[in-house]
């Protein structure tokens, strides 16, 4: 038997009121949750920011370098220069759409006859960057070799990843090159897939400049870019065997800006353990 004093049945009007209050509370709680915005509710700023992600962009400029260094090697030696100082003019033009870009880059050295023209196709997303590029250089030919002469081209793919805007890992492998072959014991040739990897760390020093330390090496025999040294000469017909460290660098850099124009300046030191060569490199540029 249930006593009436133990059970409370609200009057209809109170029950209806409490029910309406409960539904109102649920409605308020629901609207406070994170839900996808209605497209009609987007502000003009939101639309502009979304459009900026996939829009056309460009950059143009040039560097002036006291020498053209690549993977720890002085490229002027390939062009016949022996002064170890060969001022180089290096223009660049980049056209991009969103995270994809096409870049044209060139080098013309003052004292030697080394000239180069590179074409890049790249993708960059946050810390990841992937490129495929073609290098055209008429070494010793005063850049007169026909552009479609396959003996003057090589095709390379690279992948970079930067952690915390400080630590950068880089890997490059050449897939096509007329001289990138290793002769096997039976006299036949196989493609070497010459490669290069690099670890770089950048440390800002207050607002003064950035300090970058680089260590780079070839993981295995790289016929087309990693030669042996004989006296003061490089023997490109006899590549260095196996793993070799080729690039130990320390660079101080700073970028000055004025409106949309930037003026990067860097001073670096490079030591190549394989060739036992030391280099000082001064570079300045102009970009807009």
Task: List the model feature ranges, each with a label.
Residues 54, 96-100, 124-126, 162-164, ...:
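Short strand-coil-strand connectors
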């Amino acid at each position: 038997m249930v006593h009436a004093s133990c059970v409370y049945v609200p009057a209809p009007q109170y029950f209806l009121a409490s029910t309406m209050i409960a539904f109102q509370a649920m409605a308020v709680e629901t609207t406070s949750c994170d839900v996808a915005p209605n497209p009609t509710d987007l502000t003009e700023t939101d639309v502009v920011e979304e459009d900026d992600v996939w829009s056309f962009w460009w950059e143009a400029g040039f560097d002036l370098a006291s020498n053209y260094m690549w993977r720890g090697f002085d490229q002027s030696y390939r062009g016949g220069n022996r002064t170890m100082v060969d001022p180089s003019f290096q223009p660049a033009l980049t056209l991009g759409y969103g995270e994809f870009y096409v870049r044209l880059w060139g080098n013309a050295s003052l004292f030697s006859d080394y000239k180069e023209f590179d074409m890049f196709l790249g993708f960059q997303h946050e810390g990841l960057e992937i490129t495929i590029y073609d290098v055209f250089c008429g070494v010793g030919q005063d850049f007169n070799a026909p552009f479609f002469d396959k003996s003057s081209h090589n095709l390379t793919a690279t992948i970079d990843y930067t952690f915390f805007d400080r630590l950068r890992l880089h890997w490059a492998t050449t897939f096509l090159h007329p001289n990138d072959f290793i002769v096997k014991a039976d006299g036949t040739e196989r493609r070497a897939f010459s490669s290069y990897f690099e670890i770089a760390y950048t440390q800002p020093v207050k607002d003064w400049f950035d300090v970058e330390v680089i260590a780079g090496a070839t993981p295995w025999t790289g016929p087309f870019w990693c030669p042996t040294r004989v006296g003061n000469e490089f023997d490109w017909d006899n590549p260095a065997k196996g793993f070799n460290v080729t690039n130990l660098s320390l660079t101080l850099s700073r970028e000055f800006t004025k409106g949309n124009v930037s003026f990067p300046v860097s001073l670096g030191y490079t030591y190549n353990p394989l060739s036992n060569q030391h280099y000082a490199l001064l570079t300045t540029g102009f970009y807009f």
